[in-house]
């Protein structure tokens, strides 16, 4: 059995997808939840769960251990969430084990706001106004970090006073009204195939106005909108040499779209299309430059997942852990005794239905009942 390493802030989705395709899995992440460990032969911790930050030393130590260990050789590693901010770490890791994904230099370039939005402008692809220097009137502007992830880096520019951009990854972007959306696609360094378009669940968390909390898809859009999104995906894949599963984030306001960024690694939205062949497709796209002719969803129903964040500090009791483990709609299940500060991710929920609105309602109802159970003293 070929062995594959998967890494990220959370490696659960990648670990389950790799196991589904018949790989032995070594998972590297911050949480080590029950689902991840069930799908993996080994688990390595690569950072403190509450920090949501990947520790470079731990990642490289884990990869080095995999190089040295006896038994089946690890064929490579797939970086997931959290690595879009770490091109230097991708380079260092690739020197130890083959990196099966977008190369470090391409990640660096696609996350450079000047180069990224320059490519969009050169191809007349719509996006919200951006600038490197602070606007004279910050009202209606966001301050973003091109190396950030999950929306935790986004702030209202007006709330931080006379902000100055301290490094090249920070930039200002005009807030655009509408629905937060994404396109899930796979690229081979030159061409790309669009898998589906999704709605994103985005919520304010304290001073952070746009924190990622989940996704719903595939959702139906007009043929014209799908064409424009597909054109943007193909232009960016070729311009930056993207490889493997990626996603394009954009805003939709009626018939208008505004491209926001590319996540140059397997996105959370890939879980909406859970089926055999996703990791096989990743390897073929990255190692052989082959794209699948098409990958229809295993179901025509709409799926959704949502991250459940702690509303206050809590410790997961054995009874609470048992409750989570017994629910088929709960994933990324933590172990009993796990402690969470306010704003920490606890687990995730899934639902499916005929429409995005139905799925959204099911997720919301499940979140309310779940939090009531976890916050009620046992």
Protein language model regions, located:
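Short acidic-glycine loop/turn motifs at beta-strand connectors
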Residues: 187-192, 252-256, 311-312, 352-354
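Peripheral (often C-terminal) accessory segments that flank ATP-dependent C-N-forming ligase machineries
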Residues: 281-378
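ATP-dependent carboxylate/phosphate-activation module, predominantly the ATP-grasp catalytic core
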Residues: 177-240, 263-286, 294-300
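A short glycine-rich, hydrophobically flanked beta-strand micro-motif that places a catalytic Asp/Glu
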Residues: 242-254, 294
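A short beta-strand motif that forms the metal-chelation/ATP-contact edge
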Residues: 142-144, 185, 255-266
């Amino acid at each position: 059995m070929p062995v594959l390493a998967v890494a990220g802030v959370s490696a659960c989705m990648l670990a389950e997808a790799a196991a589904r395709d018949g790989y032995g899995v070594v998972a590297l992440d911050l949480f080590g939840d029950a689902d991840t460990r069930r799908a993996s032969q080994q688990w390595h911790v690569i950072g403190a769960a509450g920090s949501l930050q990947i520790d470079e030393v731990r990642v490289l130590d884990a990869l080095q251990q995999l190089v040295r260990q006896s038994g089946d050789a690890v064929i490579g590693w797939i970086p997931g969430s959290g690595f879009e901010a770490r091109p230097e770490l991708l380079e260092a890791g690739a020197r130890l084990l083959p990196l099966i994904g977008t190369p470090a230099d391409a990640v660096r370039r696609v996350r450079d706001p000047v180069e990224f939005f320059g490519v969009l402008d050169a191809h007349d692809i719509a996006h919200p106004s951006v600038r490197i220097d602070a606007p004279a009137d910050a009202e209606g502007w966001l301050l973003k970090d091109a190396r950030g992830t999950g929306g935790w880096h986004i702030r209202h520019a007006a709330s931080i006073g006379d902000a100055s951009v301290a490094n090249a990854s920070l930039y200002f972007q005009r807030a655009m009204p509408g629905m937060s959306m994404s396109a899930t696609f796979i690229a081979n360094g030159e061409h790309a195939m669009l898998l589906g378009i999704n709605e994103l669940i985005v919520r304010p968390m304290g001073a952070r106005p746009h924190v990622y909390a989940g996704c719903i898809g595939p959702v139906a859009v007009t043929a014209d909108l799908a064409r424009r999104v597909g054109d943007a995906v193909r232009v960016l894949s070729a311009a930056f040499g993207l490889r493997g599963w990626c996603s394009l984030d954009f805003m939709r306001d009626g018939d208008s779209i505004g491209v926001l960024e590319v996540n140059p690694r397997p996105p959370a939205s890939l879980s909406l299309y859970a089926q055999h062949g996703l990791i096989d497709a990743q390897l073929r796209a990255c190692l052989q430059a082959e794209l699948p002719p098409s990958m229809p969803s295993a179901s025509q129903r709409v799926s959704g997942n949502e991250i459940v964040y702690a509303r206050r500090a809590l410790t997961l009791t054995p009874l609470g852990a048992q409750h989570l483990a017994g629910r088929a709609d709960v994933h990324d299940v933590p172990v009993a005794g796990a402690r969470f500060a306010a704003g920490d991710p606890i687990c995730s929920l899934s639902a499916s239905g005929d429409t995005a609105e139905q799925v959204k309602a099911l997720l919301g109802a499940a979140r309310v009942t779940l939090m009531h159970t976890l916050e009620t003293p046992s």
